[in-house]
Amino acid sequence: FTLVCASGNVINAIFDRHIDAMHATHLIIPKYFSLKFSWMLYVGFITLGAAISFYLAYRTHQIILWWFYPICVFLLWIYSYKLKCFPLLGNILVATFTGLAMLFIPFAFRENMSELRWMDYPLWAQLNYRFVMLGIFAVLCNLCRELCKDLEDFIPDSSQFCESTAVYYGISTTKFMTVFCLIALS
C-alpha cells in the first residue's frame, strides 16, 4: 500500500509540475528531480509494488486479491491525470482512498473476524461498527484536507484552467463545504 501511495505522489507531482511551478514551495519537479528520473521512479515503485503484492497474494493463496493493486494504481493515475481538475469527484476519490486504508486491518484478519462472529457476536458487531465509524471519520478528515488544498491552490489551478472544487464552486462555497465536513466530524 505504501508503494501505491508513493507512486501516486510521484505521478501527481509529474502531472502537477506546471501548477506547482506557481508555488515555489510545492515545486518538486524539476527542483529536486528531473522529469525523466520522476517517470523512472514512478515505474520503479509500481513494478516493485506489483511484485510484492503478487508475492503476498501467492503466499496467502489469494491470487484474486492481487487485482486490488492495479485498480488502486489506475485510480491514482486517473486522479492525477484527469480527476484532480474535476470538481469534488477527485477530492472524494482521494479522501476515500486515503481514509479507508485502515479497513485493511479487519480485511487482513477476516478469518479471525469470521470466527469471532460465531463466538461473540456482540463483540464482532461492536468492532465492525468502530471500524466503519473510524473509516467515515478518516474519509471526512481527508476530504477536509483535500478541500483546504484546493483553496490553497485556487490561483495556480485557475490560471492553468484546472476546474478544482474551489475554482468551480468558488472560494465561499468550498469553505462552506469544508466547515460542513468539520461539523460532521464533531
Predicted ranges, named:
Residues 1-15, 49-50, 63-77, 123-148:
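Membrane-embedded alpha-helical segments that form the functional core of polytopic membrane enzymes
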Residues 13-17, 87-92, 110-119, 151-155:
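A cytosolic-side transmembrane-helix exit/cap motif
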Residues 57-60, 80-89:
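Membrane-interface helix caps and helix-loop-helix hairpins in membrane proteins
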Residues 49-57, 76-80, 101-109:
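Structural signal for membrane-spanning alpha-helices in multi-pass inner-membrane proteins
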Residues 17-63, 69, 161-186:
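Multi-pass membrane catalytic core of lipid/isoprenoid biosynthesis enzymes
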Residues 31, 92-110, 166-171:
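Small-residue-rich segments of transmembrane alpha-helices in multi-pass membrane proteins
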Residues 46, 81, 99-100, 113-186:
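C-terminal membrane-associated helical module and adjoining short loops/tails
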Residues 41-43, 86, 90-95:
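Membrane-interface loop-to-helix entry segments
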